[in-house]
């Protein structure tokens, strides 16, 4: 993971952003019909875990899409100063997506009729749980790669306040 660069992270960032937007669309449609009491609608139905799954799926979609904005900023600036925000928000998005993943698995395990939109939403959440984990691993691999912009305050980089981390003899100017 030491050689992970923006050429590898950027396509995964775009893929995850598109998938999170699709999750927002399907989750909001299903949740709207579920709240309206249209559980006999061919696209909704579900079981006891459906409501909880829909709530966490829409939450994962919104937080995931928002974390991709921090990721876009990091890929554009490619500095250590933006890496922390991008990695932290991606980790939070993955945690919420993992919760939605667990509820999707529970909903599939319980069984019963589920409409095609609900099954598509389950599939997207399951796929996103793994692609987001890969994205988080790639970002955290960037913490140790040292291939960020020079002078951006990264680990081991020379920046104006770097004298605090050197022996006293070397800190004198």
Swiss-Prot record:
Entry GO CC: membrane
Cystine bridges: none
Keywords linked to the UniProt accession: Membrane, Stress response, Transmembrane, Transmembrane helix
Ranges annotated as spanning the membrane: 9-29, 43-63, 83-103, 124-144
Gene induction: Induced by heat shock. Induced by drought, cold and salt stresses. Induced by abscisic acid (ABA).
Protein location: Membrane
Free-text tissue specificity from the UniProt record: Expressed in roots, leaf blades, leaf sheaths, stems, spikelets and embryos.
Taxonomic superkingdom: Eukaryota
Pfam family, one: AWPM-19
UniProt topology in membrane: Multi-pass membrane protein
InterPro entries: AWPM-19
Protein role: May be involved in abiotic stress response through abscisic acid-dependent signaling.
Protein name: Membrane protein PM19L
Organism: Oryza sativa subsp. japonica
Gene symbol of the encoding locus: PM19L
């Amino acid at each position: 993971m030491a050689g992970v660069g923006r050429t590898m992270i950027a396509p995964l960032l775009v893929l995850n952003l598109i998938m999170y937007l699709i999750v927002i669309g399907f989750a909001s449609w299903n949740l709207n019909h579920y709240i309206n009491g249209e559980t006999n609608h061919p696209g909704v139905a579900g079981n006891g875990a459906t409501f909880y799954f829909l709530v966490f799926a829409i939450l994962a979609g919104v937080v995931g899409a928002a974390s991709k904005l921090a990721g876009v900023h990091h890929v554009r600036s490619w500095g250590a100063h933006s890496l922390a925000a991008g990695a932290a928000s991606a980790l939070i998005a993955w945690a919420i997506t993992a919760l939605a993943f667990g509820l999707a698995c529970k909903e599939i395990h319980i069984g019963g009729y589920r409409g095609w939109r609900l099954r598509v939403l389950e599939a997207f959440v399951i796929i996103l749980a793994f692609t987001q984990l890969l994205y988080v691993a790639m970002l955290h691999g960037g913490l140790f790669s040292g291939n960020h912009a020079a002078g951006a305050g990264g680990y081991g980089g020379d920046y104006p306040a770097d004298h605090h981390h050197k022996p006293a003899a070397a800190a004198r100017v």
